[in-house]
From Swiss-Prot:
GO cellular component, one term: ribonuclease P complex
UniProt EC number: 3.1.26.5
One Pfam family per UniProt: Ribonuclease_P
Keywords of this entry: Endonuclease, Hydrolase, Nuclease, RNA-binding, tRNA processing
Family affiliation: Belongs to the RnpA family.
Superkingdom of origin: Bacteria
Protein name in the entry: Ribonuclease P protein component
Gene Ontology terms: biological process: tRNA 5'-leader removal
Keyword Heme tagged: no
Gene symbol of the encoding locus: rnpA
Amino acid sequence: MKKKYRIKKNEEFQEVFQRGASTANRQFVIYTLDRPEQPYFRIGLSVSKKLGKAVVRNRIKRYIRQCFLELKEEIAPGKDYVVIARQPVAEMNYAEVKKSLIHVLRKSGGLKKGGQPSHSA
């Protein structure tokens, strides 16, 4: 995923937390902030040390980034997304992570209307 699609700075995370809307399920919390002037979406990831050691946390982040990469045609542009992983994610495989992310993105309005993501895992 290219650098322009990532949220890295603390100030940017804080802005999304404070001004954005949150949606959650048992595995993820997603904060969404509209940025109409931005022709693409950006994502920021937050995976706490409570979820496991570095290997586990990095695997979770890879899974989430890969999901966004595969779903990029269906994800609404002009938004910033901050994804916070919760405890159950540590034991999930890629297909389960993707299904859960699609669910919470749909709930948050992050998927384009009528966009049916392919369920190939």
